[in-house]
C-alpha cells in the first residue's frame, strides 16, 4: 500500500475499480454490491443515472480495496448472469470507459467548455451564422435588447467583453443582418475595415444601435466603430439598414445640428452629393433651421466653390452653386443642392417655402442649365446662386448689411446698402425686404412666370438691376429654348422672343427705387408677405446685377439696351456714382 499512496488518488482509484456494464435497469446498488462482494470486500458500488430523466443508464463502477481484487473480479465475474443479463466486467481505465472513469474519478459530471466544441478559425463564421440563424426571433430580439442595455449601462465592460470574445461581436453583427437592422453589404465592409473600435465604442455605443429596433447593442459594439468612418467613405451607407438618420448623422461627418456653424465655414466634412462645392452645404443643412447668418454663408460657399471670401467683382464665377458646371450632375442648379438638403429636412423648414426648391423644380422641368446654354452658360449659374443666398438669409431674422455680409455682398435682409457696397454697388435700391420676398422660392422662379414677367417689365424693370458682380452672363445670344423652365432663365438667359431680359423683372424687388409702377406684384418695402412674382423678380434682378460689361456686350442689342437703362436708373435712385 505504501507504493499506492505515492500514486495519484484518481489513478489509484481507477486501478482498484472495475467497470460493470449491461446491468438490468431494475437492479439496485445493494444487489450488485452483494454479487461483487463474492471476490472480495467492496468499498463502494455506484450506478450511473441519466441527469435529465433520473433513470439508470445500465452501467456502474465497483471499487475494491486493492488492484488485485479488482483484477480477480474481472476474471471471475465477467459474463455473470443477473436478472437474465450477462454482466460485463472490465477495467475501469480502459479506453471505452473513459467517460465513466472521469465521472468516477471526479465524482462530478464532466464540465463542458462554455464556448462549445472547438472549431477551426476558417469554419468559425459559418458555425456562428448557423447558431444565430437557429435562434427563434423572440430570443434574438431579447438578446439584442439585453446587449443594448449592457452597452448603455456599462459601455466599458461591454467593450471589453466584445474585444475578448470576437465571436460574440460577430454573432451580434450576424444577428443584426438577420433582423435587417444592418445591410449585408455594410456588414461586410465593417468586418473587413480597420477601425478604431476602442475609441468609437467607448465614446458612444448607443447611437448605432438606436438604428435597430431592439438591437443596437451589437451594432454599437461591432458596427459602430466601423460605421463612423464608413459613413464618409460610403456616403449612402445605410448603416443598420439603416436608418438613414443614423447615416445622416454619421455620414459626411455631419455633426449634430448645433454644430452646423462650423460645417458652414468649411467645405463640410464630406460632400455627400456629387455636386462638390454645393454638397458641403447640403451636409450642413442637416442641422435644421439655420440662422440667417448661417444660411448666408452656405449659399455663398457653393457659389464660391466653398470659398468663404467674397467673390472678387472682376472674377467671373465659372461654377454654379453646385460646383463645376460641367461635372455637376445636377446641372449646377440650386435645386440639386436643395434636393440634397431637403431629405435632411434642413432647407425646407427654414425657408418657409420652396426657396431652395424653386430651383429644384426647374431642374425637373427642363434640362440642366448647362445643356440649355451650352458651354459658356454655366457661368450664369452664379446668378442663381446669388439670389439664393439672400433668400436663405431671409429665413432667419433679417441681418443688417454688416452682420450678414455674403461673400456675394448680399445682405441677409436683402441687398442692403452695405452688402452692395462690398461689391462696390450701392444696394440701397434693393432693400432687404425685397430679398425677404424670398425670391429664392423656386416656384416663383418658374421659367414661364419669368417670361411673362420679363415681357411686362421690358425696360421698366431695368432699375432693379444692379451691376452687382462679375457674374458671367450668357456668352452669346441666348437660345430661345432657354425661355423654358430652365432654371437659369432668370438672368443670363433671356428668351429671344421676349427680348426683355427676364432679369429685369427683378424690379419687383421693392427697393424704393426699384419698384416699377407697371410691375404687377410689386410690394412696398414694408410688405412682409411676398408673392411668387416678387421672388421671381428678386432672383432676376440678382442675375442681372451680376452681369459684367463684357457679358452685357455679348447680349442682343435690345437686351443690352434694357440692362444699361436699368443700371442707370439704379444708380440715379441709389445715388451711386
UniProtKB/Swiss-Prot annotation:
Cellular component terms (Gene Ontology): cleavage body; mRNA cleavage and polyadenylation specificity factor complex; nucleus
Domain RRM: 16-94
Phosphoserine modification, residue list: 14, 518, 524
Sequence repeat placement: 410-414, 415-419, 420-424, 425-429, 430-434, 435-439, 440-444, 445-449, 450-454, 455-459, 460-464, 465-469
Keywords assigned by UniProt, alphabetized: Isopeptide bond, Methylation, mRNA processing, Nucleus, Phosphoprotein, Repeat, RNA-binding, Ubl conjugation
Chain spans, region Disordered: 207-230, 319-409, 509-532
Region 12 X 5 AA tandem repeats of M-E-A-R-[AG], residue ranges: 410-469
GO biological process: mRNA 3'-end processing
Subcellular location: Nucleus
Keyword Cytoplasm set for record: no
UniProt biased composition (Basic and acidic residues): 360-373
Span list, region Interaction with RPO2TC1: 514-577
PROSITE patterns: RRM
Region (Interactions with CSTF3 and SYMPK): 108-248
Pfam families in the record: CSTF2_hinge (PF14327), CSTF_C (PF14304), RRM_1 (PF00076)
Gene Ontology MF, one: mRNA binding
Omega-N-methylarginine found at: 308, 468, 475
Positions bearing the Glycyl lysine isopeptide (Lys-Gly) (interchain with G-Cter in SUMO2) cross-link: 189
Recorded superkingdom: Eukaryota
UniProt xrefs under PANTHER family: CLEAVAGE STIMULATION FACTOR SUBUNIT 2
Binding partners and assembly: The CSTF complex is composed of CSTF1 (50 kDa subunit), CSTF2 (64 kDa subunit) and CSTF3 (77 kDa subunit). CSTF2 directly interacts with CSTF3, SYMPK and RPO2TC1. Interacts with HSF1 in heat-stressed cells. Interacts with CPSF2, CPSF3 and FIP1L1. Interacts with DDX1.
Function as written in the Swiss-Prot or TrEMBL entry: One of the multiple factors required for polyadenylation and 3'-end cleavage of mammalian pre-mRNAs. This subunit is directly involved in the binding to pre-mRNAs.
This protein's name: Cleavage stimulation factor subunit 2
Amino acid at each position: 500500500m505504501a507504493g499506492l499512496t505515492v500514486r495519484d488518488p484518481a489513478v489509484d482509484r481507477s486501478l482498484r475499480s472495475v467497470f460493470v456494464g449491461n446491468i438490468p435497469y431494475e437492479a439496485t446498488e445493494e444487489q450488485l454490491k452483494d454479487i461483487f462482494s463474492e471476490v472480495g470486500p467492496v468499498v463502494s458500488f455506484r450506478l450511473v443515472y441519466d441527469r435529465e430523466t433520473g433513470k439508470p443508464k445500465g452501467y456502474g463502477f465497483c471499487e475494491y480495496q486493492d488492484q488485485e481484487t479488482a483484477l480477480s473480479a474481472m476474471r471471475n465475474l465477467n459474463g455473470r448472469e443477473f436478472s437474465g443479463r450477462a454482466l460485463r466486467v472490465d477495467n475501469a481505465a480502459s479506453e471505452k470507459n473513459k467517460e465513466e472513469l472521469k465521472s468516477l474519478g471526479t465524482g462530478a459530471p464532466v464540465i463542458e467548455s462554455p464556448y462549445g466544441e472547438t472549431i477551426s478559425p476558417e469554419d468559425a463564421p459559418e458555425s456562428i451564422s448557423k447558431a444565430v440563424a437557429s435562434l427563434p426571433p423572440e430570443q434574438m430580439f431579447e438578446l439584442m435588447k439585453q446587449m443594448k442595455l449592457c452597452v448603455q449601462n456599462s459601455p466599458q465592460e461591454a467593450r471589453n467583453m466584445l474585444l475578448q470574445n470576437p465571436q460574440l461581436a460577430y454573432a451580434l453583427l450576424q444577428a443584426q443582418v438577420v433582423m435587417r437592422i444592418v445591410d449585408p453589404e455594410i456588414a461586410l465592409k465593417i468586418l473587413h475595415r480597420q477601425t478604431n473600435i476602442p475609441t468609437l465604442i467607448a465614446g458612444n455605443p448607443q447611437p448605432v444601435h438606436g438604428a435597430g429596433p431592439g438591437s443596437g447593442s451589437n451594432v454599437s459594439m461591432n458596427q459602430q466603430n466601423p460605421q463612423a468612418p464608413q459613413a464618409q467613405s460610403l456616403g449612402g451607407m445605410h448603416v443598420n439598414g439603416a436608418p438613414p438618420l443614423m447615416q445622416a448623422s454619421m455620414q459626411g461627418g455631419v455633426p449634430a445640428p448645433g454644430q452646423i456653424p462650423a460645417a458652414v465655414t468649411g467645405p463640410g466634412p464630406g460632400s455627400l452629393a456629387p455636386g462638390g462645392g454645393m454638397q458641403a452645404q447640403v451636409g450642413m443643412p442637416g442641422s435644421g433651421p439655420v440662422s440667417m447668418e448661417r444660411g448666408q454663408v452656405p449659399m455663398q460657399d457653393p457659389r464660391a466653390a466653398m470659398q468663404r471670401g467674397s467673390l472678387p467683382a472682376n472674377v467671373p464665377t465659372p461654377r454654379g452653386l453646385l460646383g463645376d458646371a460641367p461635372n455637376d450632375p445636377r446641372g449646377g442648379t440650386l435645386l440639386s443642392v436643395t434636393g440634397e438638403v431637403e431629405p435632411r429636412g434642413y432647407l425646407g423648414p427654414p425657408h418657409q417655402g420652396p426657396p431652395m426648391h424653386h430651383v429644384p423644380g426647374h431642374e425637373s422641368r427642363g434640362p440642366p442649365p448647362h445643356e440649355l446654354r451650352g458651354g459658356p452658360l454655366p457661368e450664369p449659374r452664379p446668378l442663381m446662386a446669388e439670389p439664393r443666398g439672400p433668400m436663405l438669409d431671409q429665413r432667419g431674422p433679417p441681418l443688417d448689411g454688416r452682420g450678414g455680409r455674403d461673400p456675394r455682398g448680399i445682405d441677409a435682409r436683402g441687398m442692403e446698402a452695405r452688402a452692395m457696397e462690398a461689391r462696390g454697388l450701392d444696394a440701397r435700391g434693393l432693400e432687404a425686404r425685397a430679398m425677404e420676398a424670398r425670391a429664392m422660392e423656386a416656384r416663383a422662379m418658374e421659367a414661364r412666370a419669368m417670361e411673362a414677367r420679363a415681357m411686362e417689365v421690358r425696360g421698366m424693370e431695368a432699375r432693379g438691376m444692379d451691376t452687382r458682380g462679375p457674374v458671367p452672363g450668357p456668352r452669346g445670344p441666348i437660345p430661345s429654348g432657354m425661355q423654358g423652365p430652365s432654371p437659369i432663365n432668370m438672368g443670363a438667359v433671356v428668351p429671344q422672343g421676349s427680348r426683355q431680359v427676364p432679369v429685369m423683372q427683378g424690379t419687383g424687388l421693392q427697393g424704393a427705387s426699384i419698384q416699377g409702377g407697371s410691375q404687377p406684384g410689386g410690394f412696398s418695402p414694408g410688405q412682409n408677405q411676398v408673392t411668387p412674382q416678387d421672388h421671381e423678380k428678386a432672383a432676376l434682378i440678382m442675375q442681372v446685377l451680376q452681369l459684367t460689361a463684357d457679358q452685357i456686350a455679348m447680349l442682343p442689342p435690345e437686351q443690352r439696351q434694357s440692362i444699361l437703362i436699368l443700371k442707370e436708373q439704379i444708380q440715379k435712385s441709389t445715388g451711386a456714382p
